[in-house]
Amino acid sequence: MDILTLGWVSVLVLFTWSISMVVWGRNGF
């Protein structure tokens, strides 16, 4: 795995995590 792939994976993980935090926040968690 090269640095470009690792960068894209970290960006996708961070994006998915932030979306789930927003969804949980709206649900009252």
Curated annotation (Swiss-Prot):
The keyword Membrane applies. One of its GO terms (cellular component) is cytochrome b6f complex. One of its GO terms (biological process) is photosynthesis. The keyword Acetylation does not apply. Disulfide bonds: none annotated. It is found in: Cellular thylakoid membrane. Keywords: Electron transport, Membrane, Photosynthesis, Thylakoid, Transmembrane, Transmembrane helix, Transport. It comes from the Bacteria. Its main location: membrane. InterPro entries: Cytochr_b6-f_cplx_su8_sf, Cytochrome_b6-f_cplx_su8. GO terms for molecular function: electron transporter, transferring electrons within cytochrome b6/f complex of photosystem II activity. The chain crosses the membrane at residues 3-23. It is a single-pass membrane protein. Component of the cytochrome b6-f complex, which mediates electron transfer between photosystem II (PSII) and photosystem I (PSI), cyclic electron flow around PSI, and state transitions. Belongs to the PetN family. The 4 large subunits of the cytochrome b6-f complex are cytochrome b6, subunit IV (17 kDa polypeptide, PetD), cytochrome f and the Rieske protein, while the 4 small subunits are PetG, PetL, PetM and PetN. The complex functions as a dimer. This is Cytochrome b6-f complex subunit 8. The lineage of its organism: Bacteria, Bacillati, Cyanobacteriota, Cyanophyceae, Synechococcales. The gene is petN.
